[in-house]
């Protein structure tokens, strides 16, 4: 089966993400993790950019083994010299040089004619071969370049010693169909392509970076350039984890393989997110917090019976602990019962039904239902009295004068009372309940605690009252402490 080479540019293009600036030690730490991930090439940086960048590339070249260590350089001799110096200690090194080839770049940025651009490209590759036998050449903005001119340039740099020719979709302009045709055209029309790798480098401006990369692989690309979590300039680059997992899961379709250690994907994603400060969106494919989470009752029931009903990837294969059953307002009894079993509870059907009803009521008001929330619901259910007194409706307003309206059923008989006090909504509520019951009770203790954190957290209220010399204790649980108090 044909192998696709993975060229990781997290430390170069990925670090160009606005707001990201990694220290030398942080870059080395990421590079070592990329080596554990077993990528083929690590683009460590752009040595001419700064002294810190040079030191980072040099340190990675010295300390990181196994992958080829690459450094970027413009088609300028001083850039290439700096890259060659930084890579001197690498076990395997590569100089990656580039120049723009699109009409708009040649006219407005370079202010050079196509023939002059081609000569500069050849000169750069020839100079790079003085430092290494492994030279990659990129035709910047290839997808907006003339295809025949691309063929001319690539043939010339291959003759000059390039071992890899890269086809960048620099501004994320291509569509999968166009990019497939371009790569196939280059494969068929570059006369000296034999023995030379075709690489692709896709940006995500139209959200097509991964799709374009996969299309290029189908068209015969040998190498794909990616970043962890898809970070990078503007909208980012093709996401390493998405490309690799797609090739693995759909090997039947793409008919290629990589040497990447899938077990390290989760750890690599978390490390890059932590060190760059770029949080992974919850709905991000493969590595997002919700990628293997299920809230829908139908989906939860299916996954609990057979994981593959709603999961095409085993999260454990990627280094995650497993699937997540997220309890929320869409969850069903099967998932709720399963969660109780995980927490060590075994309820009767009657208790389960009441607890599930309480759970659904809370889930309608609370975004996230945590294990602590579930335990609080169960504790309330297990300690609840089966008395004949029930608070049906509560309405409380607060201001200079607080008022409370309650509807209480006792032995099937409804009683409604209204009270208002200046001392606040809780005082008004207790007075209304007092009047509705026709009993004079004294409040001996009132305590509110938060079960979980957050603005929609569950509040647990403990009330201790004295009636005719007897002490009664009640507990309430709700996202509304007024309701919990009743």
From Swiss-Prot:
Which residues hold Mn(2+)? 13, 201, 203, 237
Q: What is its EC number?
A: 2.3.3.13
Chemical reaction(s) catalysed: 3-methyl-2-oxobutanoate + acetyl-CoA + H2O = (2S)-2-isopropylmalate + CoA + H(+)
Cross-referenced PROSITE patterns:
AIPM_HOMOCIT_SYNTH_1, AIPM_HOMOCIT_SYNTH_2, PYR_CT
Q: Which keywords belong to this entry?
A: Amino-acid biosynthesis, Branched-chain amino acid biosynthesis, Cytoplasm, Leucine biosynthesis, Manganese, Metal-binding, Transferase
Q: Which major enzyme category is it?
A: transferase
Entry coiled-coil feature ranges: none
Source superkingdom: Archaea
The answer on whether this UniProt entry bears the keyword Chloroplast reads no
GO MF terms, alphabetically ordered? 2-isopropylmalate synthase activity; acetyl-CoA C-acetyltransferase activity; manganese ion binding
Q: Kindly list the places in or outside the cell where this protein is found, as annotated in its UniProt entry.
A: Cytoplasm
Per the UniProt entry, what are the Gene Ontology biological process annotations, in alphabetical order?
L-leucine biosynthetic process
Stretches the record annotates as Regulatory domain: 390-486
Provide one Gene Ontology cellular component. Answer: cytoplasm
Positions of disulphide bridges: none
**The protein's required cofactors:** Mn(2+)
Pyruvate carboxyltransferase domain mapped to chain residues:
4-266
The entry assigns this protein to a family as follows: Belongs to the alpha-IPM synthase/homocitrate synthase family. LeuA type 1 subfamily.
Role played: Catalyzes the condensation of the acetyl group of acetyl-CoA with 3-methyl-2-oxobutanoate (2-ketoisovalerate) to form 3-carboxy-3-hydroxy-4-methylpentanoate (2-isopropylmalate).
The protein's matches in NCBIfam families, at most eight in alphabetical order, are given as: leuA_bact, PRK00915.1-2, PRK00915.1-3
Name of the protein this chain belongs to:
2-isopropylmalate synthase
Gene name?
leuA
């Amino acid at each position: 089966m044909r192998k696709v080479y993975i060229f990781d540019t997290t430390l170069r293009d990925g670090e160009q993400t606005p707001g990201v600036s990694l220290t030398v030690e942080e870059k080395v730490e990421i590079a070592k993790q990329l080596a554990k991930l077993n990528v083929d090439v690590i683009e460590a940086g752009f040595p001419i950019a700064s002294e810190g960048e040079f030191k980072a590339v040099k340190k990675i070249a010295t300390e990181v083994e196994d992958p080829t260590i690459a450094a970027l350089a413009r088609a300028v001799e001083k850039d290439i010299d700096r890259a060659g110096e930084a890579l001197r200690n690498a076990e395997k090194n590569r100089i990656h040089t580039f120049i723009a080839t699109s009409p708009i770049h040649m006219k407005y940025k370079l202010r050079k004619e196509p023939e002059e651009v081609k000569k500069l490209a050849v000169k750069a590759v020839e100079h790079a071969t003085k430092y290494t036998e492994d030279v990659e050449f990129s035709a910047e903005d290839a997808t907006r370049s003339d295809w025949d001119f691309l063929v001319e340039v690539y043939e010339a740099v291959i003759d000059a010693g390039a071992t890899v020719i890269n086809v960048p979709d620099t501004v994320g302009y291509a569509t999968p169909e166009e990019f497939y045709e371009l790569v196939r055209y280059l494969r068929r029309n570059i006369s000296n392509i034999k023995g030379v790798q075709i690489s692709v480098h896709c940006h995500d401006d139209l959200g097509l970076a991964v799709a374009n990369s996969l299309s290029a692989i189908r068209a015969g690309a040998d190498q794909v350039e990616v970043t962890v979590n898809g970070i990078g300039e503007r909208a980012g680059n093709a996401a390493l984890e998405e490309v690799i997992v797609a090739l693995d899961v759909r090997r039947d379709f793409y008919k290629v393989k990589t040497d990447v250690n899938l077990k390290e994907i989760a750890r690599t994603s978390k490390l890059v997110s932590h060190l760059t400060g770029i949080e992974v969106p919850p709905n991000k494919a493969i590595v997002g917090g919700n990628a293997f989470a299920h809230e829908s009752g139908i989906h939860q029931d299916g996954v609990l019976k057979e994981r593959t009903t709603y999961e095409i990837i085993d999260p454990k294969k990627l280094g995650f602990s497993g699937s997540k059953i997220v309890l929320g307002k869409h969850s069903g009894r099967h998932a709720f019962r399963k969660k109780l079993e995980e927490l060590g509870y075994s309820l009767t059907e009657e208790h389960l039904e009441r607890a599930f009803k309480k759970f659904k009521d809370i889930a309608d008001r609370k975004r996230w239902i945590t294990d602590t929330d579930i335990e609080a619901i169960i504790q309330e259910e297990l300690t609840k009295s089966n008395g004949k007194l029930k608070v049906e409706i509560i309405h409380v307003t607060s201001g200079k004068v607080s008022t409370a309206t309650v509807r209480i059923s006792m032995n099937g008989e409804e009683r409604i009372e209204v009270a208002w006090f200046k001392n606040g909504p809780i005082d008004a509520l207790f007075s209304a309940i007092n009047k509705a019951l026709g009993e004079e009770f004294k409040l001996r203790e009132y305590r509110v605690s938060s079960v979980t954190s957050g603005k929609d957290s569950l509040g647990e209220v403990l009330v201790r009252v004295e009636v005719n010399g007897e002490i009664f204790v009640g507990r309430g649980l709700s996202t509304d402490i007024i309701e919990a108090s009743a």
